[in-house]
Amino acid sequence: MHFIYRVVLVLAAFALFKVDSISAGVTFNEEHLTIPRFTRPVEENLIKRQLRVMDDNERGFPSGPSLEKIEAMFQSLTNKITTKSKPSQRDVPDEKLSQLLGAAKPVNKAVEAAGRLKTLQTQKWLDEGKSTQEVFQLLELNKFMVPNFKKIEGTVFGLPDFNTWVNYVDDFNAKNPTKKESMIPTLRTIYSDEGLTRALELAKTYSTTNALATKLRKEQIQRWLDDAQTPKYVFEMFMIDDKVDGLLTNPRFIAWTKYVDDFNLQYPTSRASMEPPIAAHYGDDAVFAMLEAAKKVQLTENVASRLQAEQIKRLLNSNRSPEYVFEAFNLHETGDNLLSTPMFKTWFNYLESFNKKNTDKETLLAPIHRYYHDHGVAKIVAEGMKNPSTVELSKQLQIQRYKRWLHAERPPRDAFNTFILEKPGADVIIRYNERLDGKLYQVRLNKVSDGLLSSPEFQLWSKYLDDWNTKYPDQKQSMAKIFQALFTEDALAKMIMAARNNPSTQKIASLLENAFAKV
């Protein structure tokens, strides 16, 4: 093939020399003529290697002058031209323009001659029955530069001789219909699966290579299927750089789902689910957030629901803890209205399924308390009590919270602060003063919240006090002493007076009044 290049260089040099002589008397503008240079690296041993004479070998052309001499001559001629300005058409007389156009004809003829020589050469290879991979190497397409997937010129698709090879493959397959060869195995000699995928995706963005790239992508997928490549492997190839947002409408994802269906049909004993590769690639939390958003869109609702069901099933089969799933579902960032969200209901169903499957039960409170802490749990309970559909869950959460305090040996006075005085929406402000020794003490409140003794929080705390005294008899605490430590005498007197007027609190008011008198 080097001989062809030499012929082109000689003819081009001759033509440029002729153009130079014709245009010598013309007035030029400031623009300069840029002469392209042959920059593709050629190995020294290939330059010096003599072409074999005409016989049954791969080349049929005698050797000619050295390429170095031709390039030197060509450079000398082009230097003469590039030192002059490029003429515009309006500055060139008609007769001169005609002469210039005529002088350019040899260049066109040189290109045409090179094309004919290349056609003759490829036809000779075809007659000899050379494989498509052999011709790929003869055209030196396997020696291109380091891949650059940002522009087509950085891939094999951007090399001039690539189209020659593509045409050869078509001609070879037309001549050998029973021995057709795919381009994919040859391209895989220079690219990994990932590299070829990137190159094909880039080629699909160019109108000149879109059709070929689309065809090759189909061949690549079929080869993966024939080789029993797992859907997980193919997913990694398809979604190399794609983000999880918009995944379900991504054309490559849609093509991948078809691959999964085809794989399961062809290999029924190795059936694969779509969800695991997605979760492995993006993570459970990102996938679940994406699926929740996709379920709200009619176009993707069905596939999102299907994938979410698969994800929950996989998590349950892998015995993932409810706490892990709680975070994976992004429930740790939901806020006070946690109990009323659809995702919490899904998680709660997971919790129940997990507890049926495992002897070591998980509580409703544990993951919520881990991320929201006690005060946050109190706010979630308060918000949940406002919604009829979540009242029972709120009560269940409050009871577990209460049991946690008791198990942790938190004294009733601390529980009173947490359950009543510091509850969300409380209308009192707790203040502290400092003693001489530097320790803080709580300042007694001069007001008791209205309806305190009839509130659910007080009833819960009262039960907590009884349970505490039963469980820790040597650490018994008195309700009257706790009240007197937290409230002023005037505040307690007003509380007792108001409680006497309420039939539901008359009994507790009487008990407290008697207890205050004994303290």
UniProtKB/Swiss-Prot annotation:
Residues 1-24 form the signal peptide. It is found in: Secreted; Host cytoplasm. Keywords: Host cytoplasm, Secreted, Signal, Virulence. The keyword Secreted applies. GO terms for cellular component: extracellular region; host cell cytoplasm. InterPro entries: PexRD54_WY. The keyword Secreted applies. Induction: Expression is induced during host plant infection. A motif (RxLR-dEER) lies at residues 49-59. Its main location: secreted. The RxLR-dEER motif acts to carry the protein into the host cell cytoplasm through binding to cell surface phosphatidylinositol-3-phosphate. Effector that enhances P.infestans colonization of Nicotiana benthamiana leaves. This is RxLR effector protein PITG_15278. It comes from Phytophthora infestans (strain T30-4). The lineage of its organism: Eukaryota, Sar, Stramenopiles, Oomycota, Peronosporales.
